[in-house]
UniProtKB/Swiss-Prot annotation:
Claim: rRNA-binding is one of the keywords in the record: no
InterPro entries: HD, HD_metazoa, Homeobox_CS, Homeodomain-like_sf, HXA10/ABDB-like
Subcellular localization, as worded in the UniProt entry: Nucleus
Entry's family note: Belongs to the Abd-B homeobox family.
Protein name: Homeobox protein Hox-B10a
Chain intervals with Low complexity compositional bias: 101-112
Compositional bias of kind Basic and acidic residues: 178-187
SMART domains found in the cross-reference section: HOX
Organism: Danio rerio
Superkingdom classification of source: Eukaryota
One Pfam family named in its UniProt record: Homeodomain
DNA-binding region: 206-265
GO biological process: regulation of transcription by RNA polymerase II
Entry's Gene Ontology cellular component terms: nucleus
């Protein structure tokens, strides 16, 4: 069987003729390697331009990837994220076996998240695979997931507090604006209404201050009351001038004194009904 010559490009191989579909590719068997690292079979060739020996590849995994890509090309709706996800699963499995490469795993995680954000809506099976991958990553790096959750909670609380502050500030501005628009007359009316409310709550709101009489004034008034319970205007003026009081004060004092005397006689009659007390 004669082999056809094909143009060779570093890192890739192409054919001049019609390219076959990936579905029609047969499963590739393992490549035989010698102790020096070079291949003995002439049907295999290396893609390394330096000629150095390469590590043996996982051919079964490669064939499975190619089969998946062929099935996707034959379908109507092509989603590249599925093939990338399968390759990413292999990469994550390789990084799990090699714990000394955290940078490679973090880079692959970021690429996977970026491809998921830019890809079209996936089916339910793809969503299940993504959820399983996120659960595996959360169990693998719990500290990073906890930090991201705390950062998201802090951002939400800050946004809520900013919204509440923005809602409160217009209300404060409106109240200040209404207070500044009041005229002096309205301000005085508000002050009088507040004073009236406070005075209504107090016990002695509308009463004048009580003016206590001195002992000399009370003695002179009591003497005059013993002789005359009802005074004439001239006598009332004389008494007011003598004890340094006004005519109205003397008149009110005599009225109160007469009411007190009636009250005393009424109580005395109820206490001793047999006795009579003349006024």
């Amino acid at each position: 069987m004669a082999l056809h010559r094909h143009p060779f490009v570093h890192g890739a191989a192409s054919w001049d003729g019609e390219q076959p579909s990936p579905v029609q590719l047969p499963h590739i068997s393992a490549c035989p390697f010698t102790s020096s690292g070079r291949k003995e079979d002439p049907f295999y060739f290396t893609l390394d331009p330096t000629g150095q020996a390469r590590q043996p590849l996982d051919i079964s995994a490669f064939s499975r990837i190619m089969t998946d890509m062929g099935s996707l090309n034959s379908a109507d709706d092509h989603r590249p994220e599925t093939s990338f996800y399968s390759g990413h699963k292999l990469l994550s499995l390789n990084t799990d076996t090699d714990p000394e490469s955290p940078s490679l795993s973090s880079h692959s995680d970021s690429q996977h998240l970026h491809s998921l954000s830019l890809s079209a809506p996936c089916s339910e099976t793809d969503n299940k695979h993504d959820m399983q991958y996120l659960a595996m990553e959360s169990t693998k790096y719990p500290s990073q997931w906890s930090e991201s959750r705390t950062n998201r909670s802090i951002i939400t609380t800050l946004s809520i507090s900013q919204r509440s502050k923005d809602d409160i500030e217009p209300n404060n501005l409106q109240t200040d604006f209404t207070r500044g628009d009041k005229t002096p007359r309205e301000k005085t009316q508000d002050v009088t209404l507040e004073n009236a409310a406070n005075g209504w709550l107090s016990a002695k709101a509308g009463r004048k201050k009580r003016c206590p009489y001195s002992k000399h004034q009370i003695l002179e008034l009591e003497k005059e009351f013993l002789f005359n319970m009802y005074l004439t205007r001239e006598r009332r003026l004389e008494i007011s001038r003598s004890i340094n009081l006004t005519d109205r004060q003397v008149k009110i004092w005599f009225q109160n004194r007469r009411m007190k005397l009636k009250k005393m006689t009424r109580e005395h009659r109820t206490r001793d009904p047999g006795t009579s007390f003349t006024v």
